[in-house]
Regions:
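Non-heme di-metal
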Residues: 1-198
């Protein structure tokens, strides 16, 4: 099902350590709108999709989100490697450091650890695809917020790439809802569960 290519989807080369940025960007690793939740959401939702095209789309995007998880983890790692003790003490990264040193742990910028409660798999294709539209928009907004707080061009380059992919995924999920409606002969899919009521 998966083929692992031993390179990142987009290159990550951060030259300057920055614990403040790491403490913010970790949210896209394990925060409520981050890549871990996105990948698990889509790879789980695919099972209840009634059509192969939709299963394939969720598999493709879910797999891509795993690649984005790897990219965000790489950013956090590169921002925190070789930090001095004073850089850690004088930053918002210090509380994270106490629990995880410089390991990459799935948590939100707020310090709340990743939880499956931040994602949804309903088993109703319309409900799940609508959830996915919202998830992609929330991830895009989070990347926008990171760009507002970041002054590192190496970080911003990668964040802009990830932000663009959220927009593409949003568009694909919109197309998926349209495809679902067409496949159901324009039945009012908002009053039925296509996974159960076909």
């Amino acid at each position: 099902m998966f083929i692992y290519d031993k390179k990142l989807q987009y290159p990550v080369k951060i030259d300057n350590p920055n614990p403040r940025l790491a403490a913010i960007i970790i949210s896209q690793y394990g925060g409520p709108d981050g890549e871990l939740g996105a990948s698990l959401r889509y790879l789980s939702q695919r099972y209840s999709m009634p059509f192969d095209e939709l299963k394939g789309l969720l598999t493709d995007i879910g797999t891509e989100e795993l690649g984005h998880l790897e990219m965000v983890g790489t950013i956090v790692h590169q921002l925190t490697r070789n930090l001095s003790e004073s850089q850690i003490k004088d930053s918002a990264f210090a509380p994270y450091f106490v629990d995880h040193t410089v390991g990459v742990y799935p948590t939100a910028a707020s310090g709340f650890p990743w939880s499956a409660a931040s994602m949804q798999v309903k088993g109703d294709p319309i409900a799940d695809l609508a959830e996915d539209l919202g998830a992609e928009q929330k991830a895009r907004v989070t990347y926008d917020n990171i760009l507002r707080l970041s002054d590192d061009p190496d970080v911003n380059d990668v964040i802009k790439f990830l932000r663009e992919r959220e927009i593409v995924h949003f568009q694909r999920f919109g197309e998926a809802i349209q495809l679902l409606r067409e496949k159901l002969n324009q039945k009012n899919v908002y009053y039925m569960n296509p996974a159960m009521d076909l």
